[in-house]
Amino acid sequence: MYKTKCLREKLVLFLKIFFPILIYQFANYSASFVDTAMTGQYNTMDLAGVSMATSIWNPFFTFLTGIVSALVPIIGHHLGRGKKEEVASDFYQFIYLALGLSVVLLGLVVFLAPPVLNHIGLEAPVAAVAVRYLWFLSIGIIPLLLFSVIRSLLDSLGLTKLSMYLMLLLLPLNSGFNYLLIFGAFGVPELGGAGAGLGTSLAYWVLLGISILVLFKQEKLKALHLEKRIPLNMDKIKEGVRLGLPIGGTVFAEVAIFSVVGLIMAKFSSLIIASHQSAMNFSSLMYAFPMSISSAMAIVVSYEVGAKQFDDAKTYIGLGRWTALIFAAFTLSFLYIFRGNVASLYGNDPEFIDLTARFLTYSLFFQLADTFAAPLQGILRGYKDTVIPFYLGLVGYWGVTLPVAMVFDSLTDFGAYSYWIGLIISLIVSGVLYRWRLTVIMKRFESRKA
């Protein structure tokens, strides 16, 4: 990050930060995309099992990665104030925090996931695949969270290209391991859908090893003196948790409601479960666009707010939201035109392709709502405003989705689509609430400037 003097310089800097994050996010979401698509090519039953497993995994994992992402605004404020010497200390505290959170998530996966999956009415083979997938995926919990901390450090320093290059390694690693383990190639045991979980875990262990080497060899990072290990500092840990818990909670509130809907799909046929998850999986991949805008906004806004350049922060807000709208126009057009082709990536059965294409039509409205709501979340994080947005997210996601979905399911013949309608309306409501909160926060900072 560096100070800019005019709109053109701000646009150039914003795009320099945004595009590597976008590619990074695509690579990040590609792990789930590859797991789902390759399992779908194996068979529909295993795809349904992986779908149910990810419905349990995603909320908890995104909750914890949301917590460690608090490192971005913390370092952003340090840099804005010219206190670069504080960076290494906060980095190490978040490493310790990530290790502790890994143990928590491991316990949840091992002890809670199997009972849940075995008592929601799944067909026995589907439940068996889901349990094995989660157990294999849990092997990669530690590298997943530690890499999230390293990535947050690099992003907050403006080294988003480095994050991008590292994350681009994930796709070939994950695809290669998945091919071996799902289909049993070259004499490797054939694990089916469960092998996708092990493939992802192995890919992240390799990625973590490479990231650590880069961290200590990168010339731009040597000034931080990361080679000097800094002991545990409970005050900084508490600050990180205080800021990160609402961020993680907000992400959890959003992802968990999607997962609950995924679990509710268990009452429908395996074909509907597989089609729902395939459409949701591709929607998550497309979410990389607004999510990247959100991450870039958190970086640039936190820097300008830390430097008390509130007018510059406001300029970045406008740039970010216009960028989100422009990209949305392209992604929505692409998905509408090629929704049938996208559906065929996940399976060959004509009925499956037709049903998945219908779900993808509903996902167009997801993306439109996310274009409005997601950048606002990043902006609020840049202002270090995380607690109130957490409660707003709870109201928007949990207070709207299920009531609306159940009304549609009971009073109409929309069936499984009722729950997608509930999700769409909840995203719109959440976006309106976040916009109201941003107006309040910006007025508060404007009054301080005066």
Language model regions located:
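Short alpha-helical transmembrane segments in multi-pass integral membrane proteins
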Residues: M1-I21, I75-I142, V188-L245, V301-F366, ...
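Transmembrane helical elements of multi-pass membrane transporters/channels
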Residues: K16-D35, F136, A203-L207, S211, ...
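N-terminal transmembrane alpha-helices
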Residues: E9-A37, Q41-Y42, N58-A70, I74, ...
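Structural signal for membrane-spanning alpha-helices in multi-pass inner-membrane proteins
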Residues: V109, N178, I182, S211-L215, ...
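Short runs within selected transmembrane alpha-helices of multi-pass transporters and secretion channels
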Residues: V68, L137-D155, S163-N174, A196-I212, ...
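Small-residue-rich hydrophobic transmembrane alpha-helices
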Residues: L47-G107, F111, L144-G158, L162-S163, ...
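Transmembrane alpha-helix boundary and packing residues in multipass membrane permease domains
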Residues: I21, Q25, T36-A37, P73, ...
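Helix-terminus/linker motif at the lipid-water interface of multi-pass membrane proteins
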Residues: F26-A48, L117-A124, L180-L191, F252-L285, ...
